[in-house]
């Protein structure tokens, strides 16, 4: 698989993990401060990967547009 596909799969996996953490907390409440920190860390990693992936896609799109414009 391409690096982009791997990145997308990782982001989707992290999104699922974050959702599972939040569902558990919503069902039974917060067990400890450690649990809250784990959730915060998961959300932070997820948002960082989404941001990086977004920048990668944006730059790829810009390069593609530039390439298409120079060919015309």
What are these model-predicted stretches?
Residues 2-72:
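Amphipathic alpha-helical polymerization modules
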């Amino acid at each position: 698989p391409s690096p982009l596909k791997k990145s997308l799969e990782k982001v989707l996996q992290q999104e699922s993990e974050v959702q599972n953490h939040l569902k558990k907390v919503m069902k039974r409440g917060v067990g400890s401060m450690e649990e809250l920190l784990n959730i915060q860390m998961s959300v932070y990693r997820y948002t960082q990967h989404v941001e990086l992936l977004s920048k990668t896609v944006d730059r790829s799109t810009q390069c593609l547009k530039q390439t298409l414009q120079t060919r015309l």
